[in-house]
């Protein structure tokens, strides 16, 4: 089969005989539509590479993809935000122009419950508080005698080398 370049085909098109030009025009129109469809498909594939096809309508009515909202993995190298809220620091300026910074108290009832706290502490000083442990998971509820713990200690240990060296004591008898 003879192969022609594109330029040669364009030259032959002008001098070629075409008995049915409407068929050729319909064929050329179909080729153009297929070419446009292929280009649109390539663009759609490029677009789908960066998103999964899900879109939403923004406040202006434009359709936008979600790819800027749900990245696959966020960066862990950046600083994490400090989510603890700090109380408002109040600055008081006196007559001389000195500014004093008053930090908020850390406990909520620091000054209101002062009397109740001292009353509770005084009641504890007067008598002894007996605490009973929860013996549900313990082996025995019997109180431990400290003298038993001392008696369990080994005070004398047996040394075999000293026993071998002291054969003279046993032989004399």
UniProtKB/Swiss-Prot annotation:
Assigned GO CC terms: cytoplasm
Basic and acidic residues bias (residue ranges): 115-129
Keywords: Cytoplasm, Initiation factor, Phosphoprotein, Protein biosynthesis, Protein synthesis inhibitor, Translation regulation
Localization: Cytoplasm
GO biological process: negative regulation of translation
InterPro entries: Caf20 (IPR031456)
Superkingdom per UniProt: Eukaryota
Assigned protein family: Belongs to the CAF20 family.
Record function comment: Acts as an inhibitor of cap-dependent translation. Competes with eIF4G1 and EAP1 for binding to eIF4E and interferes with the formation of the eIF4F complex, inhibiting translation and stabilizing mRNA.
Name the UniProt record assigns to this protein: Cap-associated protein CAF20
């Amino acid at each position: 089969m003879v192969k022609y370049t594109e330029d040669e085909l364009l030259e032959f098109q002008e001098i070629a005989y075409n008995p049915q030009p409407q068929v050729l025009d319909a064929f050329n129109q179909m080729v153009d539509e297929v070419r446009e469809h292929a280009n649109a498909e390539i663009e759609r594939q490029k677009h789908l590479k960066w998103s999964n096809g899900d879109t939403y309508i923004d406040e202006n009515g434009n359709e936008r993809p979600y790819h800027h909202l749900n990245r696959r993995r966020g960066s862990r190298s950046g600083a994490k935000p400090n989510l603890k809220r700090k109380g408002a620091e109040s600055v008081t300026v006196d007559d001389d122009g000195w500014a004093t910074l008053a930090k908020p108290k850390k406990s909520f009832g620091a000054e209101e419950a002062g009397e109740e706290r001292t009353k509770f502490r005084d009641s504890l000083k007067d008598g002894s508080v007996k605490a009973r442990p929860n013996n549900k998971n313990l082996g025995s509820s019997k109180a431990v005698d400290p003298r038993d713990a001392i008696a369990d200690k080994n005070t004398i240990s047996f040394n075999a080398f000293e026993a071998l060296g002291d054969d003279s004591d046993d032989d004399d008898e």
